Design a protein with these regions (language model features):
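Feature marking well-ordered beta-strand scaffolds used for ligand recognition
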Residues: 1-461
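Secreted, short cysteine-rich peptides and small extracellular cysteine-rich domains stabilized by multiple disulfide
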Residues: 461-478
Length: 478
């Protein structure tokens, strides 16, 4: 059955601008250059930089092309994949691009290099590759300890085949050095469990998402190690367990977390209001990426968990403790949601002033008020024609959305969204299921398929015989 072409739907959100030439955008980061704001857009075609100081007139600065990124043996006509969560060193002006196993048409039985490109963006209008560091994974890479180290997550392609984080010393970005350690090991050798991504909170805790839940680590300073009972110094290559664990199956059936956010310190006001029941720093917001119903009715949802009772190592070991679920949300039965043969899962999100901007693939970008963590409410949504919303990013009271079908769109919330937040009003139709009808359109959503290595835990654009993604360009057969 073909995917329906989706009728556009939006409420309390308006389109401010678009970044030209950003179709197949995957992830975005920002950096300050004096008075200038620069956006880094990672795409299947490489890396683009834009001057977005004037949001009404964004200006392309440079394009590091996939042809420039191609390694010996690559087919440069095929796509770069995936760098799902680009990181930028704001001080040294370095960009980090994680390379997956199926980039540039690589397939078995041939060699399939994975690892990280380190790109100099000292001049954002003149991007230069400093190095490519090959290692046995390459899905996402995250700056640790002021970008002196990288934690890289993904499928472990070494003989161990355990879920783990790879640690790279990038103090010299021209000669990165992988350290002989395994961080956040998940499962036994050969089980094929994975880590997926790392987010660092405002306290410096590094949160690792993947199979069996989300766990946090100190990477600096002296702390009591709950796994040994001893006080020791935390390091990027030898972190100290902090808190976290699994999620009840009823709330997250796959037990696979995709990304997370813990509001604390300077970001505390971005998260739910602290209460006696849920004090400051005790909540963890995270995504289950899973594809069940077209409306995410029972899986692939947004989950808010309590970290209380997990600070003594309870979330580690063969049977990690499950965190208490505080709240859950999905687009099911929400205004702006379309039924039928469409792709739905929670994906990346970003938080500002208690509002979550959230990507849900074909169900678009949703805006949720999380003031009450037990009851998130939808205050606006943006589900344009052919939406395949990948990741949203708050930037100066606007939201940049990386949509792999439409490119990067810059959105603004309208007054109605803030009024709904102030009054606690959910923009849900109560008389009947608030769903939009499919109709014919001039545009068609990008087809998605399960990743040959991660399955539906991390889908990819399906093989298509066209100029953007030719037959075989998307990796192994799905």
């Amino acid at each position: 059955m073909d995917k329906p072409r989706l009728q556009a739907a939006a409420k309390n959100v308006r389109l401010k601008a678009s970044l030209p030439g950003t179709e197949r955008a995957i992830s975005i980061a920002f950096a300050q250059y004096g008075p200038r704001d620069v956006a880094f857009v990672s795409m299947e075609t490489g890396l683009k930089t834009f001057d977005v100081t004037d949001l009404d007139k964004p200006k392309l600065l440079d394009h590091l092309t996939k042809e420039e990124m191609a390694l010996p043996g690559d087919d440069p006509t095929k796509r770069f994949w995936e760098n799902e969560d680009i990181n930028v060193d704001p001080k040294r002006k370095l960009a980090f691009l994680a390379r997956e196993v199926n980039s540039f048409g690589r397939a078995l039985p041939g060699d399939r290099p994975t690892g990280n490109y380190i790109v100099s963006a000292v001049d954002p209008a003149d991007l230069k590759i400093l190095s490519f560091h090959r290692q046995n994974t390459g899905h996402t890479s995250t700056c640790i300890n002021d970008c002196q180290f990288l934690w890289t997550a993904g499928l472990d392609r070494s003989d161990a085949k355990t879920g783990r984080i790879f640690v790279t010393d990038i103090r010299d970005p021209k000669t990165p050095k992988e350290l002989p350690v395994s961080v956040d090991v998940r499962g036994k050798a050969g089980e094929g469990k994975i880590t997926h991504d790392v987010q660092v909170d405002a306290q410096g805790i590094a949160w690792v998402a993947g199979d069996d839940g989300t766990r946090g680590y100190y990477t600096q300073g002296w702390h009591r190690d709950p796994l040994s009972g001893k006080y020791r110094e935390a390091k990027a290559w030898d972190p100290v367990a902090y808190a976290g664990g699994g999620v009840p199956k009823a709330d997250m059936p796959t037990s696979f977390t995709h990304n997370s956010f813990r509001p604390i310190g300077r970001t505390l006001d971005d998260g739910p209001r602290p209460t006696r029941e849920n004090p400051a720093g005790s909540l963890l917001l995270h995504t289950e990426e899973a594809f069940g119903s077209p409306t995410c009715k029972t899986e692939g949802r947004f989950v808010i968990s309590s970290l209380q009772g997990t600070h003594n190592g309870e979330g580690w070991g063969e049977k990690p403790k499950e965190m208490k679920t505080v709240g859950i949300w999905s687009p099911d039965d929400q205004e702006g949601t379309i039924p039928g043969n469409v792709t739905c899962s929670a994906h990346y999100f970003d938080v500002q002033k208690r509002i979550v901007a959230y990507s849900w693939y074909n169900q678009g970008t949703r805006f949720l008020d999380i003031s009450n963590p037990a009851k998130p409410i939808q205050i606006g949504y943006w589900r344009p024609d052919t939406a395949t919303s990948w990741a949203p990013y708050w930037h100066r009271n606007t939201v940049f959305v990386a949509d792999i079908s439409r490119g990067v769109e810059i959105l603004e919330l309208e007054k109605g969204a803030y009024d709904a937040q102030a009054s606690g009003t959910n923009v849900t139709l109560t008389e009947h299921h608030a769903r939009e009808l499919a109709r014919e359109s001039d545009r068609e959503p990008v087809p998605l398929a399960p990743n040959p290595f991660y399955g539906w835990a991390c889908p990819m654009v399906a093989n298509r015989d066209d100029s953007d993604c030719g037959v075989g360009a998307c990796g192994a057969p799905c």
